[in-house]
Amino acid sequence: MSWDLGLFGAREAGERNAAASVLDARGRLQAARVALVADVVHRYLDIRMAQRQRALIDEQALLDARALQLAQVRQQQRLGTAEAVHQLQLQAGQSAALRASLRETQARSAHMLAALLGRTRPDAQWLQADAKAPLPGPQALGVAVLPADLLRTRPDIQVAQAAVERAAAEQGIAHAALYPRFVIGGSLLYSFNITQNLRTTQDNAPTFGPQIDIPLFDWGRRRSQADASELALQAAVQAYRQSVLDGVAEVESALAALDAQRERIASLQSTQQVLAERERVQDQRLKLGLDSEFGGLAPRRAALQARSEQTTALAAHALAYVALYKALGGAPLPAEDQDAADSLSLIHI
């Protein structure tokens, strides 16, 4: 065994290197937690959006089928053209293709969510269409400028900070290597001869004394290593600064996306109100005999498309929150002894 005195900053550099390793491990653990929570929420939102969209596309398919039936009757009665029938047939085919695409997206998201939750198969409810599938509504964030401390919770910034600490520790070790190193060591060598029945004083050889490492013949190598460690420290500092700038840019982009999606939802709500009023007027005209059923199908289909766009906007707004969560590194940090599954308790599926 040996005991290094750790002179000339060697002991402090070793402790700093160990602390950097702990910080790096915490950053990578936090990155795994953030990725897990974000992926679970992302797949959950995909499922809910697909459930709503499938319910809307099924209702739209019924309207398309009815419109095609009425168009064929109008063509037979010389009130419509074959081109109108062809357009409605193409429209019905596009709706069927969209329905298949939504079913595929929903199934893929359901299986991925089941895998993230440690299940072998998804719940049957996740694969059904549901017009009332819950989606979070738009909410104002209420924060104009985020504190800089929130960025420190980003895993990549923590890893970059750990790299700076490690580079500084290596630079300290390389600097300490330029000076003599003092180590107090001791050992005990014991042997036993199986041909003898008695123990003798020659069976063990203890040693104890100091060891001195002097940079005499390898001074140039140690000096070059110290210079290289200094440059590595400067590179780590620059990488840390770039990580901070990238984090700020990602957070700003997420906030901009939140504002844009909020404005989009507000615009779609205004459009939906206009279409709802138009549909109400059309129904009134139909009751009074001033219009036909065929003429009222187009406004109803436009209202369904507006609802579909609003569903997409709500999901995009929720995903923007997920992007902001990832951009902030999942701030605040969870307790070290908290299991990763506890982070999923806020998500009700």
Which sequence ranges carry the predicted segments?
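Acidic, low-complexity, intrinsically disordered peripheral segments
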Residues: 120-121, 288, 309-346
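Transmembrane beta-barrel architecture of outer-membrane proteins
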Residues: 42, 87, 205-207, 253, ...
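Periplasmic alpha-helical coiled-coil/stalk elements that build and connect Gram-negative outer-membrane
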Residues: 11, 27-146, 257, 261, ...
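Bacterial Sec-pathway N-terminal export signals of envelope proteins
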Residues: 79-82, 135-165, 215-216, 241-244, ...
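A glycine-/polar-enriched beta->alpha junction
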Residues: 1-16, 27-34, 38, 148-149, ...
